[in-house]
Amino acid sequence: MTKPFSVLLASLLVITSTVSPLASAQQSQPLDRIAAIVDEDVVLQSELDRAVRNVKSQYAGRDNQLPPDDVLQRQVLERLVLVKLQVGRAEGSGIRVSDEELNRAIASIAQQNGTSVDGLRQKLAADGMGYADFRASVRDEIIVQRLRQSFAQSRISVSEGEVDTALAQQATTGSQYHLAHILVGLPEGATAEQIATGQKKVDGVKALIDKGELDFSAAAVRYSDSPNALEGGDLGWRSLDEIPNAFAQLIRDMQPGQVAGPLRGPSGFQLLKLVEMRDANAGGEKKVLTEYNARHILVRIGDNQTEAQAKAKIDTLRARIVGGADFQATAKESSEDTNSRGQGGDLGWFPADAFGPDFGKQVEGLTDGAVSEPFRTQAGWHIVQRVGTRQTDVSAENQRAQIRETIGRRKLEEEYNRYLQELRGEAFVSFRTGDRADADATAAPEPAAAPAAPTPPPAQPTR
C-alpha cells in the first residue's frame, strides 16, 4: 500500500516546516498569526499547525502514544524555534543555498517519491501545502545540514589513539546496542530547586514505565526534553565507542528491555533503555580488493596538437613498443603526463576505478605484461601496460575508517546538542500561543514546563 505523500515527507517537514513569513502571510486569508518571535524572525501559526499535523500523521493509529495537544504543540514549537535559530546563525556566518542547488534537491526528493517535480507540486497542493512554502522548508533543511557540517569541520577531530582504543574495546565486547532515552533537561547552572524539580519529574516518569502504565516510547514522546522525543527517544544502533563513557559500563551490564536510571548527565537527568543488542561481527566478511600495477603513456589534445595528430602519435609509440622498445624508456621520452613520466609512466598500485571507468576497463581487460590498444579519455590518448595484480585485504582499513566515523558522529552529537542549548539560551524567544503566550525568555524552558510528577493519562496500554 502506498503511503500518503504527507507521511513520506513528514520527517523533513516536522523538522523544517518553516516558510517565508511574507509569502505565507500573503497567501493566507485572514492574515496569519505569529506563534513565536525568535530574535528577529517569527514562527507563524500556520507553520506550527502544519508541523503538528505532520507529527500526528506519523502516529496514525497510535494516537494514544502522543501527549495532549497542548504538550505536543509546545514540543513542536520548540523544535521550530531551534530551526529558526540555526538558520539565522548559518546565514549570519555566510552559509547560503543557491536556487540551482535547491532545484536539484527538490528534483531528488521528487525522484525518491517516484514522481516528477510537477507531480510533487500537485501532491503538495493536495496535502494543503504551497510549493513556495515547501521550497523554503527544503532550503532551511539544507542550511541546517551545512551548519552542522561546518561545526563538525571546525570543532570535531578524532585521533589515531582514540581509534586504537575503540578497536581494542570492540574486540573485547563485539556488541552493538539499540538504545532509547528520555531526557529531563536542566539549564546550565541549575539551582537546587530546579534540580529537585527535575529529579521529581524523572522519578515520576520512571515509575509510570516500571508499573507498565506507559511504555518507554510513549513516555519519551510525552515527557522527554530531548530533540528526538517525538521519535520515542530512539537513538538507533550504537557501538560502545559511540556511547558516552559514563554510560558505557552500565549498558554493558544491562539486558534487552531493561530501563536504567535516572542518570545525571551534563544535560540533565536521563532514563536509558536497552531495546536490543547484536554481535557487531556477526556476518562480517573479510573484504579483499583487487589492485593493479600499471604504466601508461599519455598524448594530450590541445591547441598545439589536434585529435588526429595525437592519435597518430600514440599509434606510433605503441608500434615501437610492440616492436621491442622498452615501455618505461618510451614513457620517459614521450609521455605528456608530467606526474608519471619521470617514473617511466609508473602509476603504482591502484584499484580499477582509481582513474575513471574507461581507464579501469582497459587495465582489467589486460593480462600482466600486455600493452593495450590506444584508447581515449578526457585527458587525451593513452596506452597502458599492466605490470601485475594483487589481492589486498582492506577489512582492517575499512574498520578503522568506520570506527573513526562513529566516534566523530558521537562527538558531533554531544557537542552540537550543547551548541544548540547555548544558542537557545542566548536567544530572545517570545511565545504568542497556548499557555505560554507572551512568555518572553532568553533561555529554554525549565523542566517544570511539563508536569513535575507525571500521572498516567486514562486508558493507556500496558506492556
UniProtKB/Swiss-Prot annotation:
Residues 174-276, 289-388 form the PpiC domain. Residues 1-25 form the signal peptide. It comes from Xanthomonas campestris pv. campestris (strain ATCC 33913 / DSM 3586 / NCPPB 528 / LMG 568 / P 25). One of its GO terms (biological process) is chaperone-mediated protein folding. The gene is surA. It catalyses: [protein]-peptidylproline (omega=180) = [protein]-peptidylproline (omega=0). Keywords: Chaperone, Isomerase, Periplasm, Repeat, Rotamase, Signal. Residues 440-452 have a biased composition (Low complexity). The PPIase activity resides only in the second parvulin domain. The N-terminal region and the C-terminal tail are necessary and sufficient for the chaperone activity of SurA. The PPIase activity is dispensable for SurA to function as a chaperone. The N-terminal region and the C-terminal tail are also required for porin recognition. Its EC number is 5.2.1.8. The lineage of its organism: Bacteria, Pseudomonadati, Pseudomonadota, Gammaproteobacteria, Lysobacterales. Chaperone involved in the correct folding and assembly of outer membrane proteins. Recognizes specific patterns of aromatic residues and the orientation of their side chains, which are found more frequently in integral outer membrane proteins. May act in both early periplasmic and late outer membrane-associated steps of protein maturation. Residues 329-348, 434-463 are annotated as: Disordered. Residues 453-463 have a biased composition (Pro residues). SUPFAM superfamilies: FKBP-like, Triger factor/SurA peptide-binding domain-like. GO terms for cellular component: outer membrane-bounded periplasmic space. It is found in: Periplasm. It is an enzyme of class 5 (isomerase). InterPro entries: OMP_Chaperone_SurA (IPR050280), PPIase_dom_sf (IPR046357), PPIase_PpiC (IPR000297), PPIase_SurA (IPR023034), SurA_N (IPR015391), Trigger_fact/SurA_dom_sf (IPR027304). This is Chaperone SurA. GO terms for molecular function: peptide binding; peptidyl-prolyl cis-trans isomerase activity; unfolded protein binding.
